[in-house]
Amino acid sequence: MDNRKRLAYAIIQFLHGQLRHGGLSSDAQESLEVAIQCLETAFGVTLEDSDLALPQTLPEIFEAATASKEMPQDPRGPDRTPPSEEDSAEAERLKTEGNEQMKLENFEAAVHLYGKAIELNPANAVYFCNRAAAYSKLGNYVGAVQDCERAIGIDPGYSKAYGRMGLALSSLNKHAEAVAYYKKALELDPDNDTYKSNLKIAELKLREAPSPTGGVGSLDIAGLLNNPHFITMASSLMNSPQLQQLMSGMISGGHNPLGTPGSSPQHSDLASLIQAGQQFAQQMQQQNPEFVEQIRSQVVRSRTPSASHEEQQE
């Protein structure tokens, strides 16, 4: 049977599917209908010719072809021909150029250069790991995860690949998986402070999911303001004669009731305000240390994992 008819049928089938589920505008739908009619006329096939149907739809065929291109055979496999000296040298040059583009924050260019290096030497874990860092900078965390998987597959002892995998998974809010990869990174590089810090953050995020009513950086402002301990201590602070005297002086136009002779009003007011805040913090710590620890945990949880160490490309 003519494969051209099979291909035409697959395209017509795909276009019909887009008409049903594509969410297209009326103009786009009309254009697809015209395209379908043209294909049916040109190749003499219609959607009713089910004998022309392939085992897979066109999108499935495309997805499989794309996956096979992105995931070539195992670079460590026995059938893989090692790169020539010239290819290895060129791959290193491309990697170095990619590193320079990373420093210039030209992340798309870096992805392209690392990809070229991978084409020449797909058995080098560093190239995949570096491209993962570039993908993360572009917000393509799924791509970063895939490249880290490739790097780990090539070199299971490569700690940086586990660390970058943890960063990408954290960005995807997959904190349980991120914790596992950070632990593996620390197992391979136990003195790495970045891995330790990122592991702590991921563990906190895993234990305490961010509140949907939380404020900036997932700090639960709404919960804080509704906490009776916080309200009681805040009321005590606002009723403090020292704070009331300070605020009265500031409102009256710079009068410095708490200042010392010869000190500037602005400096003394600021110092007094800081002093009042410190007293409030001390009072909170003494009266409800568990609540203070809860606030501290929320602040730590609101931080994002650091990529400072990971930005150093090899």
Swiss-Prot record:
GO cellular component: a single term: membrane
TPR repeats: 91-124, 125-158, 159-192
Entry-annotated residues carrying Phosphoserine: 84, 302, 306
Modified residues (N6-acetyllysine): 137
Chain spans, region Disordered: 65-99, 249-268
Subcellular location: Cytoplasm; Nucleus
Basic and acidic residues: compositionally biased ranges: 71-83, 90-99
Modification Phosphothreonine occurs at: 81, 304
GO biological process, one term: chaperone-mediated protein folding
InterPro entries for this protein: SGT, SGTA_dimer, TPR-like_helical_dom_sf, TPR_rpt
Pfam family membership, one: TPR_8
GO molecular function: BAT3 complex binding; identical protein binding; molecular adaptor activity
Subunit structure: Homodimer. Homooligomer. Interacts with DNAJC5 and DNAJC5B. Interacts (via TPR repeats) with HSP90AA1. Interacts (via Gln-rich region) with SLC2A1. Interacts with HSP90AB1. Interacts (via TPR repeats) with HSPA8/Hsc70; the interaction is direct. Interacts with BAG6 (via ubiquitin-like domain); interaction prevents interaction between BAG6 and RNF126. Forms a multiprotein complex, at least composed of DNAJB12, DNAJB14, HSPA8/Hsc70 and SGTA; interaction with DNAJB14 and HSPA8/Hsc70 is direct.
Function: Co-chaperone that binds misfolded and hydrophobic patches-containing client proteins in the cytosol. Mediates their targeting to the endoplasmic reticulum but also regulates their sorting to the proteasome when targeting fails. Functions in tail-anchored/type II transmembrane proteins membrane insertion constituting with ASNA1 and the BAG6 complex a targeting module. Functions upstream of the BAG6 complex and ASNA1, binding more rapidly the transmembrane domain of newly synthesized proteins.
Protein name: Small glutamine-rich tetratricopeptide repeat-containing protein alpha
Organism lineage: Eukaryota, Metazoa, Chordata, Craniata, Vertebrata
